C-alpha cells in the first residue's frame, strides 16, 4: 500500500498525502447491493440543526454490507475489492457458489480470487467467519458480534482488530485496540484477520475543500463569535473567553463528565487506557 506525496503544483496540492490501493476496482458498485442515501444537513424533522458542522458533500450511494455473515457453509470467491465512501475500510464483493453476491468488509490479507466461507467448521483463515467458541486463543479477529445473530459491531474500521485472549465459562475475552478487555458471548461470530486499508490514518487531505467534499463544514471558535451566539463571544479585541471553556449552551467542556451514572461494567474486565 504505497504512500504518495503529491507534487506541490498548487497550494491545494502542497500538503496532500494519499495512500494508493492498486487492487481497487475502478468501476461502479454492484447495483443490487446499493440504495439511496439522502442527506439531512444535520437537521431533524423540524428543520433545526441537531448536529453541527454537517452539510454539503458529494452524492453517495449506500453499499449494503453483510455484517451477519449468515451464508453458512457456502463457499464464496472474492470477485473484487472496492472503495466505499461511507466507511474508512474497503469492501469486497463476494460471489457465492449458489449465485448470490454480497459485500463484506475487506480483510487485510484477502485478495481477488480467494475463497472464503462461514460456519462452525470453517478453516482458520483470513476472511472466514466462525463463532468465538471455535477460534483458537491468540487469534486476531474483526467484525465481532456483541449479541449472537445481531451482526458485527466491534472492529469494523480500517486497520482495526481485536485479539482473543481467553475463554471463561460462556464468554470469550477480547483485547480491543484501546487496551480494553471485554467479555463477549462464545456464540457470537467474528471474522479472522485484521481489517484492510490500514494506511488510512497516514493520509493528509491537504486542504479545507477536501473536508467539504466529505460533507463536513467548518468549526468556528466561540471566542470568534458574538455574545448572542456563544458564552465566550464578544469583548474588545482578542480575548481568552474569560471563563472555563464551555459549549455554546454553557455546559463545561475539556474533561467535564456528562454521562449518566447508569452504565454497567458487567462485560468490561479492564477499562481502556486513558
UniProtKB/Swiss-Prot annotation:
A single GO cellular-component term on record: large ribosomal subunit
Source superkingdom: Bacteria
Keywords: Ribonucleoprotein, Ribosomal protein, RNA-binding, rRNA-binding
GO biological process: cytoplasmic translation
Ranges for region Disordered: 222-257
Molecular function GO labels: rRNA binding; structural constituent of ribosome; transferase activity
Its job: One of the primary rRNA binding proteins. Required for association of the 30S and 50S subunits to form the 70S ribosome, for tRNA binding and peptide bond formation. It has been suggested to have peptidyltransferase activity; this is somewhat controversial. Makes several contacts with the 16S rRNA in the 70S ribosome.
PANTHER family documented for this protein: LARGE RIBOSOMAL SUBUNIT PROTEIN UL2M (PTHR13691:SF5), RIBOSOMAL PROTEIN L2 (PTHR13691)
Family per similarity comment: Belongs to the universal ribosomal protein uL2 family.
Subunit and partners: Part of the 50S ribosomal subunit. Forms a bridge to the 30S subunit in the 70S ribosome.
Record-given protein name: Large ribosomal subunit protein uL2
Species name: Nitrosococcus oceani (strain ATCC 19707 / BCRC 17464 / JCM 30415 / NCIMB 11848 / C-107)
Amino acid at each position: 500500500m504505497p504512500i504518495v506525496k503529491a507534487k506541490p503544483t498548487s497550494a491545494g496540492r502542497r500538503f496532500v498525502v494519499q495512500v494508493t490501493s492498486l487492487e481497487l476496482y475502478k468501476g461502479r458498485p454492484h447495483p443490487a447491493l446499493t440504495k439511496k442515501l439522502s442527506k439531512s444537513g444535520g437537521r431533524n424533522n423540524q428543520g433545526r440543526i441537531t448536529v453541527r458542522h454537517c452539510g454539503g458533500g458529494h452524492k453517495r450511494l449506500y453499499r449494503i454490507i453483510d455484517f451477519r455473515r449468515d451464508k453458512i457453509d457456502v463457499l464464496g470467491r472474492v470477485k473484487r475489492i472496492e472503495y466505499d465512501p461511507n466507511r474508512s475500510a474497503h469492501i469486497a464483493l463476494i460471489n457465492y457458489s449458489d449465485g448470490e453476491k454480497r459485500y463484506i468488509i475487506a480483510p487485510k490479507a484477502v485478495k481477488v480470487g480467494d475463497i472464503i466461507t462461514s460456519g462452525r467448521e470453517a478453516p482458520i483463515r483470513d476472511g472466514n467467519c466462525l463463532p468465538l467458541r471455535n477460534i483458537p486463543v491468540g487469534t486476531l479477529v474483526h467484525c465481532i458480534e456483541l449479541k449472537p445473530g445481531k451482526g458485527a459491531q466491534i472492529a469494523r474500521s480500517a486497520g482495526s482488530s481485536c485479539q482473543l485472549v481467553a475463554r471463561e465459562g460462556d464468554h470469550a475475552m477480547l483485547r480491543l485496540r484501546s487496551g480494553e478487555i471485554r467479555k463477549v458471548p462464545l456464540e457470537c461470530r467474528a471474522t479472522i484477520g485484521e481489517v484492510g486499508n490500514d494506511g488510512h490514518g497516514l493520509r493528509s487531505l491537504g486542504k479545507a475543500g477536501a473536508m467539504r467534499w466529505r460533507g463536513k463544514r467548518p468549526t468556528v471558535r466561540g471566542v470568534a463569535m458574538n455574545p448572542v451566539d456563544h458564552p465566550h463571544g464578544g469583548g474588545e479585541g482578542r480575548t481568552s473567553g474569560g471563563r472555563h471553556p464551555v459549549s455554546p449552551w454553557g455546559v463545561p467542556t475539556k474533561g467535564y463528565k456528562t454521562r449518566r451514572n447508569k452504565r454497567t461494567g458487567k462485560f468490561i474486565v479492564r477499562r481502556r487506557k486513558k
